Amino acid sequence: MIAMRIYQVIISFEVLSELEAMAKYIASIYRPESGHNYVNRVLGQLAALSYSADAYQHSRFALAKAIHPKAKTISIINHKWTVVFHIDGDFVIVDKIIPSKSMH
């Protein structure tokens, strides 16, 4: 049996600020709870990196590599967002969330 590595996920302050702005924007268009629900979905997918981070290869995108030389990427929320993260020891560090269309 292969032991699965579990990481602690750390979200950068920049990403937290982006998520807060995202929640406020969605709440201004729809309902306040819509913004919170959306961000909670994002946070749930980020939390899943604690056990899935090793499954992703280093990114081939120049934008991701510019953020961190050992960046990995994952698409979330119906491929609308790309999460740029890297692994450092026992930690998965979420560096940035970018609209997926800007990655290509």
Residue ranges of each PLM-predicted region?
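Enriched for short, Lys/Arg-rich terminal
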Residues: 2, 74-104
